[in-house]
Amino acid sequence: MTSTQRLWSGALPLLTALIVSIAATASLAGPRARDLGVPFEGTPGALNAITDVAGVEVGHTTVISGDGAMVIGKGPYRTGVTIIHPLGKTSLDGVAAGRAVINGTGEWTGMHLVDEVGQFLGPIALTGTGNVGLVHQSMMDWSVGKVPEEALFSRLLPVVAETLDNRLNDVFGHGLTRDHVFAALDGAKGGPVAEGNVGGGTGMIAYTFKGGIGTSSRVVSAGDTRYTVGVLVQANHGDRNDLRIAGVQIGKEIKGAWPEVNGIVAAGPDAGKPQDKNSLLIVIATDAPLMPHQLERMARRAALGVGRNGSTAGALSGEFALAFSTSHVIPLGGKPRLPAIINDTDSETMNALFRGVVQATEEALVNQLVASETMTGANNAKVYGIPHDQLARIMKARFPRR
C-alpha cells in the first residue's frame, strides 16, 4: 500500500473533507465551455450550476491513488462519489420527483419508489459501478443520529446511481470507503460546483475524451413568473465520431488526443468502431412547483439535450435522468407542501421549463468535457482531456462574431 492509499483509507472524515475541499477548489480554477467561445442558447443563472436552484447543495469526494499495473484490491484507484442534497444536508424532508430511462443498461437505486409514489427522501449519490453497495449502506449509516429513530424507515431506500469507471480504476478493488462517503455528505454546500475529474466523475470517459462531472442552469420566464432549472451530469458515454458542440462535428475536427496504453495509441479490431457505452447520469433540479408526472416529463426532455451533443444512447450505455422540485416538499411525517400548481395545459410555462432542461443538459455535458483533464490510470491507460486550444480555435472560426 502506498502512502497515498494509506492517507485516503485511514483518514478521519474531517481530514478527508479537508483534502476533498482543496481538490474541489483547484478544479474550479479552469475555464468552462463559454470561456472557450462555445455559444449556447438561453439565460444561465448566476453560477450556471445546479446550485442556482436555492437550497441545493453538492459535495464531492475524489479518490486518486496508485499507478501502473492493476492489482485487484490494491489499485490504482480513480474513483469517488458526488452527493446532491435537494434541500440541503440539514433538511429531513423529501421532494417530489420523476424520472426517465433513456437506455436501461445500468442501475439507479430507489427509482421504483419514485415511479410508484413520485418522491424520495434524502440525498442523491453518483458514483462508480463497484461502489454502489458501499455508498448505499454508508448513506443509511449517515442518517443514524440525524433522522429521528422513529422515522429512520424513510432512509431505507437511498438513491444511488452508477457509471462504470473500469478503464482507469480498479473497479473490483473497492477503493471508496465509508469515510469518503461521509465526507461528501457532510462537505456538500451551495455555491460554485467543482467539475471534471471530481467525485463520481473521477474515472469517467465521455466521447472518447476524459469525462466527469458537469453542470449548468437556466432561468426561464413564463409571463411575470421566473423559474430556475439546474442540471448536473456524470458523463461516461458517447463516441468521439458522434460528438457535436454547438452543432459542429468537433470529434471529427480535433486532431490527436486519442486514448493510449503505455504510450501507444489504442489499436486492434475495435479501433475506430463506435464506443458509445458505459453510461450517463442526469440530475435535474427546479424551483418550479411541479407534480411528479410533470417532473417525469422534464426528465424525458433531458434526452433531447444529450442528442444535441451527438450521443445515440448506445446499446450498453445506461442513461438515466431524475428530476425533482424544491418547491414541492414532502415533510417527514407530514403533508406535502406545494405553494401552487402549474396546469399541464399551461403550455407557456411547461415549454419554458422543457427548453431550460434541454439547454442546461447540453451545456452541462460540454462543461464536463472542458473541465476534465488528461488522466493516466490503471494499467497505464491514458485518456486525454479535450484540447482547449483546438476547441477554442474551431469555435472562433465558426462563430467569429461572438
Curated annotation (Swiss-Prot):
UniProt cross-references to Pfam families, sorted A to Z: Peptidase_S58 (PF03576)
Xref: InterPro entries: ArgJ-like_dom_sf, Peptidase_S58_DmpA
Activity control, per UniProt: Inhibited by AEBSF (4-(2-aminoethyl)benzenesulfonyl fluoride, Pefabloc SC), ampicillin and AMP(hyd) (ampillicin-derived penicilloic acid).
SUPFAM superfamilies listed in its UniProt record: DmpA/ArgJ-like (SSF56266)
Coiled-coil features, chain-numbered ranges: none
Any single Gene Ontology cellular-component annotation: periplasmic space
GO terms for biological process, alphabetical: proteolysis
pH influence on activity: Optimum pH is between 8 and 9.
Post-translational modification remark: Autoproteolytic processing to generate the alpha and beta subunit is required for self-activation and is proposed to use a similar mechanism as substrate cleavage.
Active site: 279, 317, 319
Annotated signal sequence range: 1-29
EC number per UniProt: 3.4.11.25
Location within or outside the cell: Periplasm
MF term (GO), any: aminopeptidase activity
Disulfide feature: none
Listed result of changing residue 277 to A: Delays precursor cleavage
Subunit and partners: Heterooctamer of 4 heterodimers ((alpha:beta)4); each heterodimer is composed of an alpha subunit and a beta subunit processed from the same precursor.
Protein name: Beta-peptidyl aminopeptidase BapA
